[in-house]
């Protein structure tokens, strides 16, 4: 009994709590290790400008993921999902089997094939927020919180959120603290946790 009391007093005296600190999970952001050579990432990994593409820092492991991009400045851009094999210097993306993206003209491309298209009167403009849902089969697009009902599919393997810009486009990413509530069942990207 005295030994237990002494341990508690020693921990308090040393300023410790006696607990092992938990590591905080890193925030998902744009990954400067997986970006095109002429891409510029600023705002703590949340804003992309320059020319080229960039992957997010975490893959989409969970069943239903949601993320958003806000168009700060128009130009040429695209958002969606891609594997780590995608060439982030060769834009527009969607030209090969390693990316599935919606381009600034509203067309969704995978493997150089147009898979779907936003209605002509619903193209994203400067200031708009584009949400993406992905469930390992289908990618869906939301414009300012509204489902655009233009699904696309076909990509295989481990995918990451991807964005590309050119011609003065600037986009901000939101991987948490969203502008719009994710659709039911979809949530922010979760880092895979390993328990040993």
Curated annotation (Swiss-Prot):
Span of domain B30.2/SPRY: 2-184
Keywords assigned by UniProt, alphabetized: Acetylation
Annotated Pfam families: SPRY (PF00622)
N-acetylalanine modified-residue sites: 2
Gene3D superfamilies from the UniProt entry: 2.60.120.920
Domain of life: Eukaryota
Cited PROSITE patterns: B302_SPRY (PS50188)
Keyword hit for Transcription regulation: no
InterPro entries on file: B30.2/SPRY (IPR001870), B30.2/SPRY_sf (IPR043136), ConA-like_dom_sf (IPR013320), SPRY_dom (IPR003877), SPRYD7 (IPR035766)
Protein known as: SPRY domain-containing protein 7
């Amino acid at each position: 009994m005295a030994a237990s009391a002494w341990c508690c007093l020693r921990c308090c005296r040393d300023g410790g709590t006696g607990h092992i600190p938990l590591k905080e999970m890193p925030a998902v952001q744009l990954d400067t290790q997986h970006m095109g050579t002429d891409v510029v990432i600023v705002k703590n990994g949340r804003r992309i400008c320059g020319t080229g593409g960039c992957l997010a820092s975490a893959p989409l492991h969970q069943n239903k993921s949601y993320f958003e991009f806000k168009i700060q400045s128009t130009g040429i851009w695209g958002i969606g999902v891609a594997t780590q094999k995608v060439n982030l210097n060769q834009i527009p993306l969607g030209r090969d089997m390693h990316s599935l993206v919606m381009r600034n003209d509203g067309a969704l491309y995978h493997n150089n094939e147009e898979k779907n298209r936003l209605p002509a009167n619903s193209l994203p403009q400067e200031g708009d927020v584009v949400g993406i849902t992905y469930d390992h089969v289908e990618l869906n697009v939301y414009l300012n919180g509204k489902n655009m009902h233009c699904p696309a599919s076909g990509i295989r393997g481990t995918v990451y959120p991807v964005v590309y810009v050119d011609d003065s486009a600037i986009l901000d990413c939101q991987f948490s603290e969203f502008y719009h509530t994710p659709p039911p069942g979809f949530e922010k990207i979760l880092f895979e946790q390993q328990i040993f």
